[in-house]
Amino acid sequence: MKICLVSDSHDNRSLLTAAVGEAKELGAQVVWHCGDVVAPTALRPLQQFGLPVHVIHGNNMGDTYAMFMLAQEPNSVIFYHGQDAGLEQGGKRIFLVHYPHYAHALALTGDWDIVCCGHDHRPAIKTIDTVKGGNALLLNPGTVAGVGPRASYIFGDLETMEFEIRDVPGGKK
């Protein structure tokens, strides 16, 4: 299963749409959003891709009720999880949380194969040694909106566990 991981879209519909569009062309089957959507309507353009979008909120969250209602609309692709989400997809245990320090702590537990975060706008792919003797991947896609650093997202394959940080088409480099 191929994934598109984004975070910190900060209402930038055009760059969010560009990232998800490119990821779908590359074969993405699902989108994970690690928060700071701001206005829930910023996710509406993602409907066109027909991919499930799992989203949590961050510290820049607009109307959570509107987000909940958007997810309840008929044929909605939005799955709103609140402040964090534990998912099982492609045979992997995934956790989405906005803050990197929580993500690091969760990765250390060994309870998750992949822990994803955002918030600091710094893209990173790290392997974390867990307390159970294995390892977990800690993924931070940076900011898809290009607020501060370049606009970026992560494209990955859950089967091969290969992930790459990609520049968003049309975003600053």
Model-derived regions: residue spans:
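N-terminal active-site segment of His-dependent metallophosphoesterases
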Residues: 1-49, 64, 68-69, 75-76, ...
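Generic beta-strand structural signal
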Residues: 33, 88-89, 156-158
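Conserved beta-sheet core of the metallophosphoesterase superfamily
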Residues: 54, 93-95, 99-168
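Helix-adjacent hinge/juxtasegments
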Residues: 50-99
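Active-site metal-binding loops of divalent metal-dependent hydrolases
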Residues: 7-10, 35-37, 58-61, 99-101, ...
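A short acidic, often aromatic-flanked loop/helix-cap motif at beta-alpha or helix-coil junctions
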Residues: 85-87, 146, 171-173
